[in-house]
Amino acid sequence: GHLLGSSSIEMWITEKGEECKIVFSGDIGNNNRPLIRDPQYIKEADYVVMESTYGDRLHGTPPDYAVELAKVLKDTFTRGGNLVIPAFYVGRTQEMLYFLRRIKTEHLLDEFEPFEVYVDSPLANEATTIFSEHKYDCFDEEAMELINKGITPISFP
């Protein structure tokens, strides 16, 4: 859900004949994010201990991030600029690569092709390799459809 390989821990404790369920988790994440499978929610627990960066927010329907990014790139390239996108090395970098692949393969910026993309982070490059190595375990249906067509979702021509 939240990150590649993330998980929650469920524990059942019995004390004085009473059983209770305790759940430990990091941020669970949102549905409909690219690449990795949607989170599996735990339906009930007696106690929950968790971290949540955005726990107090309701997320609406997300925009088409590839289209939004293409607009920013077009504006930047039109002005003769370069775009630097800071991103967490696990998760966000791979999502950005996914969106950039879509921009290139869906011809959203043909007038500026070819444009170069650099990932200037050894950790992000290593994490991207790990994503690719564990695609069958963690990628969602949309990403697997691309893989089955011979397309790597987080790289591009």
How should each PLM-predicted stretch be described?
Residues G1-E95, R101-F112:
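His/Asp/Glu-rich metal-coordinating catalytic cores
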